[in-house]
Amino acid sequence: IPIPTSLTLSVSSLSVYTNVEQIHVYVTTLGAGNCTITPSLPNGLVFDSVSCSISGIATETLPQTTFVVSSYDVFGASASFTLTVNMCSNPIIEIERVYKGQSSKEGYKLINLDTEETILSVEPNSNQQDNTISVQRICSTASRYEVETTSSGDYWYKYSYLNVYVLHGAQREQILR
C-alpha cells in the first residue's frame, strides 16, 4: 500500500451566504488526520483536527480567503481551498421537512417560478430517515416559488409534512404548511 504524500480536499472553492448555507469541507486523502488550518475560520464554522473537516454555517461575511489544511499524519502535506461568505440581502427562505414514517418514499422540489429553475430537490430514496427533521435555507432571489411534493409510493405518510418560513433577522414567519 503506497503511503500518501499529498493532501486532497473535497472542494477547491466555495461561495456561500451568511446564516444560510451549511458547508462541509473534508480531506479525501486516506490516512489523513491530526490536521491544522490557517488562517482562523469565520464565526459559525468549526474545524475538527481529528477528521480534518470544516463544517457549520458562517455567521459573518468574509472576502475571498484561501485556507490551508495541513496533516501531520501525511508528513505535513497540505491542501488549500478558497472561501467567500457574502451577506444575503434578500429574505431567507427556510424549508423544514418533518419525516415520520415511510420517509424514504417521499421527496420534494422548490422551484423558482421566475426562471423555472429547481432550487432545491430531495428525491425519494435519497437517504431520508424516519422520525427526523431536515432544515434547508436559501437566499431568495425569486418573486414566486412553487413547492412540488413527490412520492415513489401513492402518497406521503399522514404525519409527514413540510413547513416553509421567511426569516426576517431573528423573526421567523410561517408561510406554508
Language model features with spans:
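Short, surface-exposed beta-strand/strand-loop-strand elements in extracellular ectodomains
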Residues: 105-113, 154-169
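Strand-loop-strand motifs at the edges of beta-sheets in extracellular beta-sandwich domains
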Residues: 43-58
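Solvent-exposed loop segments of extracellular immunoglobulin-like
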Residues: 31-37, 41
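C-terminal edge beta-strand
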Residues: 1, 75-87
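Exposed beta-strand face motif in extracellular beta-rich ectodomains
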Residues: 63-67, 143-145
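Short glycine/proline-centered coil/turn motifs in the loop regions
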Residues: 29-33, 61, 100-102
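Solvent-exposed, low-complexity, repeat-rich "mucin-like" stalks and linkers
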Residues: 4-32, 83
